[in-house]
């Protein structure tokens, strides 16, 4: 199966299936000498670990302990491929025996069978959310690399902020952090959905702070294009808008060009930049200081497709049937999806940073 790798110079390859012996990642292109230890990766894994994100997350029994197999020695990267493994505890197929010949609606069961003619039906196999563990591993390494270069260059470190602005169709009064308690209306809505064997989606607002200007490679390596690809590759993400997004289509050119706003989302012509002159003008010399920029975007996350409610579908013979998906599953992917979104941002920026070093003397 192709397309399991991401990046040009800083590359991530993920491996493993939902119920295989393990999942993990191989990162290549990370420079030597970057401080890195297992704890740097583990703290990110703990944020998406099953059962650790409140009453509406999956109760699947997994420890999600990372093992660094190569590429790191005495707390620093070697410049060689970094291989990291997370072993799966739950590898039994008992919850999926009744589904091996039936296609679950909203899943990749049918499309994988259609394309490959052979698939791992246990928990979705390669299309499972367990695949995102490899992304967290890569994102953790990318984050450490960007931090190291920021410290070396005397710059602020990049910070990715992901908040929920809508859950289960209910808007939050203020963007909700992953560790904040759910507002009562949302909690009650999710509780009702869980009781009915149903699930919910969410809309996330995201800001990436302290991004160096000049990242991105026109025309097919535009930063917003690569960022969109990275985020849309997350299985549950079904939409993205950068900056003003669809709102930009409803305003005038003069409004959209207003440099006191950030309708561009911090990216123009596919290159990260900050045209917010009034806020960044150096009044002593009358020029805009060389600065960082802020990338703003929103993403739509679909409802979890594994639900206990009876649904109509069909089997391999093309016969209609009704099915209910058992096992342990999330009711909503917030907040467990937050570190996954962050990881993809760090991967995109780490790669763009390395690419930028060879694009200009």
UniProtKB/Swiss-Prot annotation:
GO molecular function: chorismate synthase activity; FMN binding
Keywords recorded for this protein, A-Z: Amino-acid biosynthesis, Aromatic amino acid biosynthesis, FAD, Flavoprotein, FMN, Lyase, NADP
InterPro entries reported for this sequence: Chorismate_synth, Chorismate_synth_AroC_sf
Record Pfam families: Chorismate_synt
Pathway: Metabolic intermediate biosynthesis; chorismate biosynthesis; chorismate from D-erythrose 4-phosphate and phosphoenolpyruvate: step 7/7
Annotated FMN binding sites: 126-128, 269, 302-306, 328
UniProt-listed SUPFAM superfamilies: Chorismate synthase, AroC (SSF103263)
UniProt keyword Lyase, yes or no: yes
Protein's name according to its UniProt entry: Chorismate synthase
Originating species: Treponema denticola (strain ATCC 35405 / DSM 14222 / CIP 103919 / JCM 8153 / KCTC 15104)
């Amino acid at each position: 199966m192709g397309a399991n790798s991401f990046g040009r110079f800083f590359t991530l390859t993920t491996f493993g299936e939902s119920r295989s012996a393990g999942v993990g990642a191989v990162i290549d292109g990370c420079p030597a000498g970057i401080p890195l230890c297992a704890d740097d990766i583990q703290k990110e894994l703990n944020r998406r670990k099953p059962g650790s994100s409140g009453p509406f997350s999956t109760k699947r029994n997994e420890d999600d302990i990372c093992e660094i197999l190569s590429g790191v020695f005495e707390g620093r990267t070697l410049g060689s491929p970094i291989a990291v493994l997370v072993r799966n505890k739950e590898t039994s197929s008992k919850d999926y025996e009744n589904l091996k010949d039936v296609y679950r609606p909203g899943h990749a069961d049918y499309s994988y069978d259609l394309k490959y003619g052979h698939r791992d039906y246990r928990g979705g196999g390669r299309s499972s959310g367990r695949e995102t563990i490899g992304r967290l591993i890569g994102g953790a390494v990318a984050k450490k690399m960007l931090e190291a270069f920021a410290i070396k260059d005397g710059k602020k470190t990049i910070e990715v902020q992901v908040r929920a602005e809508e859950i289960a169709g209910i808007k939050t009064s203020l963007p909700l952090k992953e560790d904040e308690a759910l507002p009562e209306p949302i909690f009650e809505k999710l509780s009702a959905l869980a009781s009915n064997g149903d699930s919910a989606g969410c809309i996330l607002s995201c800001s990436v702070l302290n991004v160096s200007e000049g990242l991105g490679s026109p025309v097919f390596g535009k930063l917003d294009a690569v960022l969109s690809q990275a985020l849309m590759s997350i299985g549950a993400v079904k939409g993205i808008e950068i900056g003003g997004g669809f709102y930009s289509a409803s305003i005038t050119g003069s409004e959209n060009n207003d440099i006191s706003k950030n309708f561009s989302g911090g990216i123009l012509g596919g290159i990260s930049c900050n045209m917010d002159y009034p806020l960044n003008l150096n009044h002593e010399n009358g020029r805009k200081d060389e600065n960082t920029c802020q990338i703003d975007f929103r993403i739509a996350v679909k409802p979890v497709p594994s639900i206990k409610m009876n649904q109509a579908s069909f089997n391999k013979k093309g016969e209609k049937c009704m099915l209910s998906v058992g096992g342990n599953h999330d009711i909503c992917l917030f907040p467990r999806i937050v570190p996954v979104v962050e990881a993809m941002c760090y991967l995109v920026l780490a790669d763009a940073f390395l690419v930028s070093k060879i694009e200009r003397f």
